[in-house]
Amino acid sequence: DILVINPLYALWETDLSDHLFAAAAHTGKTELSNNVNRIRLKTDHDYYNSGVLLMNLKKGRVMIRREEIFAFVAEHGSELFLPDQDVLNALYGSEVLALDDAIWNYDARNYRNYLLRSGGVRDMKWVMQQTSILHFCGRAKPWKHGYKYRFGLLYQHYVQLTKRFLPDHKECISL
């Protein structure tokens, strides 16, 4: 549920150093949900979105233990709202290098929040020039009937381009 609209070179070149992941937190204009998730998961760091992750595979092979994940889910299963994201944050959130969500994991539902937080700087032109990854977070998706958010037309534009330039794959693409 992501749409890449600008190059990913800078993300690819990101030095993870000792971090396990690089990810973005969707803090919103009040950071309320971020703080609720900190309390809920008993963490002292931002709540990172798992939709776009840059992974340090070498470190992950050493640090990530299946048993630890299964034990956490067994103990907290009824408390997990977004299980993959909750596990990432609870067990490994302190190992995350924070990315700018407006560039690397732009929540397509929240255009007005980004505009407000930036004092009007991060407008539609800015998004089209600076954002690399649009993320269609939540249940509403631009390929589903009734999608009402701002970036639905952009998604449809890319679907049309894909159909035009990859005609042999039309059956894999929906509007």
Question: How does the language model describe each region?
Answer:
Residues 1-31, 52-55, 62-63:
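GT-A fold catalytic core of metal-dependent nucleotide-sugar glycosyltransferases
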Residues 55-175:
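A glycosyltransferase accessory/donor-loop signature
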Residues 37-43, 118-123:
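Short, P/G- and charge-enriched loop/turn segments at secondary-structure junctions
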Residues 7, 44, 95:
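Glycine-rich, flexible loop/turn motifs
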Residues 41-52:
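A recurrent flexible, glycine/aromatic-enriched loop bordering the glycosyltransferase active site
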Residues 15-16, 45-47, 125-128:
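Extracellular/periplasmic catalytic domains that process cell-envelope and extracellular macromolecules
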Residues 12, 37-41, 67-72:
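Short, surface-exposed, charged loop/turn segments at secondary-structure junctions
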Residues 18-41, 145-151:
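A short, conserved beta-to-alpha structural element at the edge of catalytic cores
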